[in-house]
Amino acid sequence: MGHGKLKKFSENETFACLLQPASGEVLDRQAGEFWSPLNLKDHPMKGHWNEKMFHGRNCPIVLELGCGKGEYTTSLAERNPDVNYIGVDIKGARLWKGAKYATETGLPNVAFLRTRI
């Protein structure tokens, strides 16, 4: 792995704004089945994004599918503080950039979800 991916994966686990599977959850799955909170019928986030991820900010939620590094997601969140944004991508190394920026700048209305679409 190049470009510091292992360091980024490790740091991803510290970002409160990033929801992703723990490494054990991925490894416990059968071959071909990828962990996804969207596949879990009774996932604790279901119906509770504003309450749990956005700390009670009862605002509309906008999803950006395939958000990559999250530049567009974080930019929209900065421009529209009365909207909650969730960037979705499968690549943890990409999500690291957006999650790190959101954490460092204290953006309360942005979150990232690592999963397949």
Model-derived features: positions:
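Conserved beta-strand/loop positions that form the S-adenosyl-L-methionine
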Residues: 65, 88
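S-adenosyl-L-methionine
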Residues: 1-63, 71-78, 100-117
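Conserved short alpha-helix immediately C-terminal to the canonical SAM/SAH-binding motif I
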Residues: 94
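Conserved glycine-rich SAM-binding loop
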Residues: 68
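Conserved SAM/SAH-binding beta-strand->alpha-helix loop
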Residues: 91
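Short beta-strand element of Class I
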Residues: 83-86
